[in-house]
Amino acid sequence: MQVSVETTQGLERRLTISVPAEQIEKLVKDNVLREAKRARLPGFRPGKVPIGEINKRYGKAIRQDITGEVMQRNFIEAIVAEKLNPAGAPVFTPGSTEGDSFEFVATFEIYPEVVLTGLDSIAVEQPKAEVNDADVDVMIETLRKQHATFAPVERAAVADDKVKMNFIGSIDGEEFEGGKADDFELQLGSNRMIPGFETGIVGHKTGDEFEIEVTFPEDYHAENLKGKAAKFVITLTEVQAANLPEVNDEFASLFGIAEGGLDALKAEIRKNMTRELEQALKANVKEQVITGLLAANDIAIPKALVEGEVNVLRQQAMQRFGGQTENMPELPAELFTEQAERRVKIGLLLGEVIKTNELKAEDDRVNTLIESMASAYEDPSEVVSYYNSNKELMQNMRNVALEEQAVEALLKSSKVTVKDVAFEEFMNKATGRA
């Protein structure tokens, strides 16, 4: 076998491989003979079909199969010999089989050689927060509102009231589609409506008819309404006030607390809030480290890996439609390309961090991750057992652990400053509520 390697562009390589033609001819001949022995054709006894008839019927297909096998086998031998690491399947271009040799070309991309740089330039502001009694009280107040009952009142509407109304919206005196409703129910302060709508209702009583003027946000989903000033004529048909449950042991029982009453509920709330906080803190630091790593290391990436990641993201997006995708057109790759490129770069860079630091997934860390995740379920032990019995899920969790370890390794060389933050402020930002 003779091999020549050519760099075409970027990470693309072209291998020209030449092998003795007799290698193919012998295999073709052997396969034709094998087919002749087992072929059953009309007019011929089993195993007595002439070679010429086999060649006529199956010769072309047999040669194509053998040629493909020879190219694949010799390609593998060639990349091992040349120490090349393909990032995707090769494209084979077979040449002529005339003469003493068979030559073919294999075109493919290789993985980039990643050399980590600028790790000491990564700047991380590490937030430090904890759950205190006031934070637990805020959560309890939220739970009270979620379990509130409502009753009609004869007074002006205030925040947190529920109201029923009829309304008609118009722009420049013309009604618009979706701007009219009857018996519409709304809780004031829920921010379901565009800015100014809910606050415009506060202070009005049942039976009031009034107008409010609002402006649709520039990022409103309906293109024809973006940035438009609108007028709504509203008739308030009912105002309902919230009756919040008392915070006591009976309230605790609403959340499945069988023993310990209110104190047990508060302890459970604190535990859940602490778990969510720790996850959010970890995610915040990880994102800063990853962003800094990408900024310091602009690497070339194989198109094949990006295309594969695009397909994964596209499939995930389609699944979010709940399986109702039969008649949907395929989502364009452009929607996912930027995210796919970022994910491929992160994977390659973190892979090099793991390799450089000789990291192995720590069993204790894997178990802690599983237990932490399982604690959010009603029966944590059942979830832990399910993970431990599923090889694929366990491998996924080991990958998560390795990624954590890689981020921690990068933190050691990063410029880290610690900043105290309040729980509510941090979590609002982390969840996009700020």
UniProtKB/Swiss-Prot annotation:
<feature type="domain" description="PPIase FKBP-type">
    <location>
        <begin position="160"/>
        <end position="245"/>
    </location>
</feature>
<dbReference type="InterPro" id="IPR046357">
    <property type="entry name" value="PPIase_dom_sf"/>
</dbReference>
<keyword id="KW-0131">Cell cycle</keyword>
<comment type="function">
    <text>Involved in protein export. Acts as a chaperone by maintaining the newly synthesized protein in an open conformation. Functions as a peptidyl-prolyl cis-trans isomerase.</text>
</comment>
<dbReference type="Pfam" id="PF05697">
    <property type="entry name" value="Trigger_N"/>
</dbReference>
<dbReference type="GO" id="GO:0061077">
    <property type="term" value="P:chaperone-mediated protein folding"/>
</dbReference>
<dbReference type="Pfam" id="PF00254">
    <property type="entry name" value="FKBP_C"/>
</dbReference>
<dbReference type="Pfam" id="PF05698">
    <property type="entry name" value="Trigger_C"/>
</dbReference>
<dbReference type="GO" id="GO:0043022">
    <property type="term" value="F:ribosome binding"/>
</dbReference>
<dbReference type="GO" id="GO:0015031">
    <property type="term" value="P:protein transport"/>
</dbReference>
<dbReference type="GO" id="GO:0003755">
    <property type="term" value="F:peptidyl-prolyl cis-trans isomerase activity"/>
</dbReference>
<keyword id="KW-0697">Rotamase</keyword>
<dbReference type="InterPro" id="IPR036611">
    <property type="entry name" value="Trigger_fac_ribosome-bd_sf"/>
</dbReference>
<keyword id="KW-0963">Cytoplasm</keyword>
<dbReference type="GO" id="GO:0051083">
    <property type="term" value="P:'de novo' cotranslational protein folding"/>
</dbReference>
<dbReference type="InterPro" id="IPR008881">
    <property type="entry name" value="Trigger_fac_ribosome-bd_bac"/>
</dbReference>
<dbReference type="InterPro" id="IPR001179">
    <property type="entry name" value="PPIase_FKBP_dom"/>
</dbReference>
<keyword id="KW-0143">Chaperone</keyword>
<dbReference type="GO" id="GO:0051301">
    <property type="term" value="P:cell division"/>
</dbReference>
<dbReference type="InterPro" id="IPR008880">
    <property type="entry name" value="Trigger_fac_C"/>
</dbReference>
<dbReference type="GO" id="GO:0043335">
    <property type="term" value="P:protein unfolding"/>
</dbReference>
<dbReference type="GO" id="GO:0005737">
    <property type="term" value="C:cytoplasm"/>
</dbReference>
<keyword id="KW-0413">Isomerase</keyword>
<comment type="similarity">
    <text>Belongs to the FKBP-type PPIase family. Tig subfamily.</text>
</comment>
<keyword id="KW-0132">Cell division</keyword>
<dbReference type="InterPro" id="IPR005215">
    <property type="entry name" value="Trig_fac"/>
</dbReference>
<protein>
    <recommendedName>
        <fullName>Trigger factor</fullName>
        <ecNumber>5.2.1.8</ecNumber>
    </recommendedName>
</protein>
<dbReference type="InterPro" id="IPR027304">
    <property type="entry name" value="Trigger_fact/SurA_dom_sf"/>
</dbReference>
<dbReference type="GO" id="GO:0044183">
    <property type="term" value="F:protein folding chaperone"/>
</dbReference>
<dbReference type="InterPro" id="IPR037041">
    <property type="entry name" value="Trigger_fac_C_sf"/>
</dbReference>
